[in-house]
Amino acid sequence: MTLKKILIVSGTHGNEINPVWAINQFNKQFKTIDKNIEYKFVIGNPLAYERGCRYIDNDLNRSFTSIQDNSIYETNRANFLVEKFGFNGSEPCDVAIDLHTTTANMGTSIVMYGRRMKDFCLAALLQHKFGLPIYLHEKDLKQTGFLVEAWPCGLVLEIGSVAQNFYDPKIINRFLIIISSLRDEINKLKNNQIRLPKDLFVHVHQGSIDYPRDKNGNINALIHPERINQDWKPIKKDAPLFMDMEGKTKTYADEDTIWPVFIGEVAYKEKNIAMSFTKKEVVSVSDQMYEEFFS
């Protein structure tokens, strides 16, 4: 991959408005042209963004699959994005960066899907520069079709917490800091001005849990007060997870320590997810990652 163009996608979810603002602000403030790497910008789901909703028919960030239904707006939109900006598209891009916000207290983080060498290289570069935690989402058959998987290399930049359809200048500034320096960091790496770290620290997806529900499928317990806003912090056996209306607590029962992410993400209620569990892993950064990224 001779890296020439990076696709920056905002508004993949229409009610995540801070990334769109950040890109508009970037284009006004940062007019320096990089001769080596060009940014291409696109709003992923413009109709949902216009209406202020997450999606029209289906989640766009689950729509990059082989299943084709032209009656679904997001399927058509996914096809358009790949046909225009995909590796074999009319305006091909080598890398896709998908910008998202979350109502969960995730801070500024990276989401990876699978273990592609190119993705590891880019994630290592960003973690080394900004100290970002990485959520490696893999082996979840219930959740597939993510946007960045349609490109040879791609990551999600996830920032929170912020409410849906609410502008937060602090969140916007975090996007600006990373996007404004990304090309410089890639160029420095290519020119041997900086080196990748020896290790990459990731939180590997283990599964997700739903809210407790009654026999009719209604939620009958909420996330425990001690668990709210505690993303990335370890949960050990007997730690509280949920509390019902009578004040009874449901605890974590397993022996293995886990680290939760996306605790109480509002958009995930419809997916029956109250939080996801991860385990820590150290990935050795190899020369192969670097070589594949720039090949």
Swiss-Prot record:
Any one Gene Ontology MF annotation carried by this entry is: aspartoacylase activity
Please state what class of enzyme this protein is. hydrolase
* Cofactor(s) the protein requires to work: Zn(2+)
Query: What does the Swiss-Prot or TrEMBL cofactor note state?
Result: Binds 1 zinc ion per subunit.
Binding residues for substrate: 54, 61-62, 158, 268
Q: Does Repressor appear among the keywords?
A: no
Catalytic reactions of this protein: an N-acyl-L-aspartate + H2O = a carboxylate + L-aspartate
- The catalytic activity of this protein is classed by the Enzyme Commission as 3.5.1.15
The cellular component terms of Gene Ontology attached to this UniProt record, alphabetical and capped at eight, are:
cytosol
- State the family named in the UniProt similarity comment for this chain: Belongs to the AspA/AstE family. Aspartoacylase subfamily.
Output the HAMAP family linked to this UniProt entry.
Aspartoacylase (MF_00704)
| Annotated protein name in UniProt | Probable aspartoacylase
User: What is the source species?
Assistant: Prochlorococcus marinus subsp. pastoris (strain CCMP1986 / NIES-2087 / MED4)
